Amino acid sequence: MNKYLEYPEVESNRQPAKKLVVLLHGVGSDGHDLIGLVPYIKNDLPDCHFISPHGIEAYDMMPYGRQWFSLQDRSPHIIAKLIANNISKLEDIIKQKQEELNLTNKDTIIIGFSQGTMIGLYLTLIQREPFFCTIGFSGALIPPMEVNNKLTPICLIHGELDEVVGVSEMYNASNYLSKLHIEHSGHKLTSLAHSIDGRGLEIAINFINTCHTVV
């Protein structure tokens, strides 16, 4: 098996799965991090199969961990180029699992944290077929050169005390999405730093359960 296709996953409570949830971790972590959220949300999403891929690259600022792209240079145009270079590998991971489960983009939910949000939002905006929905925790939006998808609803969740990725990035993302008339919501959580808490998970669950398939 391709090394990129080896990752932790959790089957849906009900079979066959009707939705695929793709969890995208932050820089320096790996897929085992966000898969740890599944026990807290699985029962509220009984038809969802969860996968948590590892970042495409080894983390280049520490001897352990993974990354979706390097953050050595944080210039937006450099980051956009790095994401564009790696995005096809993430798409391959998702497409293979979709084929295994007989699902498509319209059945797929993207959930990212921090750097995972950055690549998850980018991935969402370049799709020809929209995802079911996308959720971004504590991240930022790096615009692609071309936006193909304006139909996937997006939920942004951010701690007001975040010192890693400031909450201003949520507002920047919201402004960008508003200009494109993309349906989205933003949630600033009080007393929360760069993390995911129970409030954020509840918002995410409610968002998923109120979304409808884009025709």
UniProtKB/Swiss-Prot annotation:
Q: Which Pfam families match?
A: Abhydrolase_2
Alphabetically sorted, this entry's keywords are: Hydrolase
- The residues responsible for catalysis, as annotated, are S114 (charge relay system), D162 (charge relay system), H194 (charge relay system)
Which GO-annotated molecular functions does the record name? hydrolase activity
User: Mind telling me which InterPro entries this protein's record contains?
Assistant: AB_hydrolase_fold, LYPA1-2/EST-like, PLipase/COase/thioEstase
Keyword presence, Hydrolase:
yes
Q: Which PANTHER family match?
A: LYSOPHOSPHOLIPASE-LIKE PROTEIN 1 (PTHR10655:SF17), LYSOPHOSPHOLIPASE-RELATED (PTHR10655)
The name this protein goes by in its record: Uncharacterized hydrolase RF_1189
Question: Which source organism?
Answer: Rickettsia felis (strain ATCC VR-1525 / URRWXCal2) (Rickettsia azadi)
Task: List the taxonomic lineage.
Answer: Bacteria, Pseudomonadati, Pseudomonadota, Alphaproteobacteria, Rickettsiales
